[in-house]
Regions:
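Short, surface-exposed "cap/lid" segments of acyl-processing enzymes
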Residues: 48-84
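Alpha/beta-hydrolase active-site loop
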Residues: 109-130
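Short alpha-helix in the alpha/beta-hydrolase fold that links the catalytic acid
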Residues: 244, 257-268
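Accessory cap/linker subdomain of secreted extracellular hydrolases
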Residues: 163-237
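N-terminal cap/lid segment of alpha/beta-hydrolase-fold proteins
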Residues: 21-49
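Short beta-strand/loop motif that positions the catalytic acidic residue
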Residues: 242, 248-250
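Catalytic active-site module of serine/aspartate enzymes centered on a nucleophile-bearing elbow/loop
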Residues: 283, 288-320
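Conserved alpha/beta-hydrolase
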Residues: 76-103
């Protein structure tokens, strides 16, 4: 066989090997719970030695394992997990109970509690810790998932590192009051007082009866137990309990979670590393403006790539 043929065969084999490495290997995974199955996607690089695995926890609302919902289609979590995969880090993304494929794990809205999400993550940790393909477990929580993740990681020897992305730095009721204060501008004071009194009552663990129809969307009886359960937690107090390496990431053009929240979390856990990413918004995409008209396309266009810095920051933190 002449030298040209050998060179051609070598280049062909090399290209096939590179192509194989670029294909994301994804397998379905199921967590069995007492109330139903929770479905996820596991991406594990082909490796002869164990690799780290990151559990990515979605934010609030009907956001699925890829970062999408009926109103938003941005593939943020899918893009992040793919980037970690290419760097040799395995990932688990899952539909939280009651969401997408895991819909049946929540029979009724009134059944769900914030603690259910925490316990689910703990069970995922237990499941993955028995998989010999993985060397250590990292928790990545986005938005509301940040609080879920930090509580699940507390005093858990199976978790080696924790990452908060756009995490809340204030209790849920405080955030809700701040948002409503802006939305209720111009409304009668009596309306504002009534709404805030309802929030105070929920904070005390009390349910509200005879909610006016105009306020039913926010205070419907079926959602009150969940609101009571999440109001128990203060993110600053929870992140202060973490003794493992911790990374706090925040974008400068996030219109849902201001930078102040990252600062509050950082003060609460001084040993944590804080990274502020310029022009990154809440869905981890580039956006130079906080104007809604410019933000909207990043929430609903899958072709817009992930911010270039966030993957590098996370990979460096996990590997070092």
């Amino acid at each position: 066989m002449n030298r040209k043929k050998l060179s051609f065969i070598f280049l062909l084999l090399l290209s096939l090997n590179i192509s194989a490495q670029l294909i994301v290997s994804e397998e379905p995974i199921v967590l069995k719970t007492k109330t139903g199955d929770i479905f996820g996607s596991l991406k594990a690089p082909n490796s002869k030695t164990p690799v780290p695995i990151a559990i990515i926890i979605a934010g609030s609302g009907p956001t699925d394992r890829n970062g999408n919902s009926q109103l938003t289609q941005n593939d943020a979590y899918k893009m992040l997990s793919d980037e970690l995969f290419y760097s040799g880090i395995a990932t688990l993304c899952f539909d939280k109970r009651g969401i997408a494929a895991s819909q049946s794990a929540m029979k009724e809205e009134s059944d769900i509690r914030f603690e259910n999400y925490i316990e689910d993550v703990k069970e995922w940790i237990d499941l993955l810790s028995n998989d010999k393909r993985f060397s250590n477990i990292i928790i990545i929580g986005h938005s509301e998932g940040s609080l879920i993740g930090m509580i699940a990681a507390e005093n858990n020897p199976k978790v080696t590192k924790y990452i908060s992305i756009a995490g809340m730095g204030l209790p849920f009721d405080v955030i809700l009051k701040e948002q409503l204060e802006k939305q209720l501008a111009g409304q009668p004071q009596v309306t504002k007082d009534l709404i805030f009194s309802y929030l105070d009552k929920l904070k005390q663990g009390e349910t509200i009866s005879n909610v006016p129809p105009t306020l039913n969307a926010l205070f419907r009886p079926s959602v009150q137990p969940y609101m009571i359960s999440i109001m128990k937690y203060n993110p600053q107090e929870e992140i202060a309990k973490l003794t493992i390496p911790t990374l706090i990431i925040q974008g400068t053009t996030d219109i849902q979670v201001p930078i102040e929240h990252a600062n509050l979390l950082s003060v609460a856990n001084p040993k944590a590393q804080k990274v502020i990413i310029e022009n990154m918004n809440h869905v981890l995409k580039d956006c130079k403006s906080s104007d809604m008209a410019e933000q909207t396309p990043t929430y609903s266009n899958k072709s817009i790539p992930l911010n270039k810095e966030i993957g590098k920051v996370i990979i460096n933190f996990i590997k070092n």
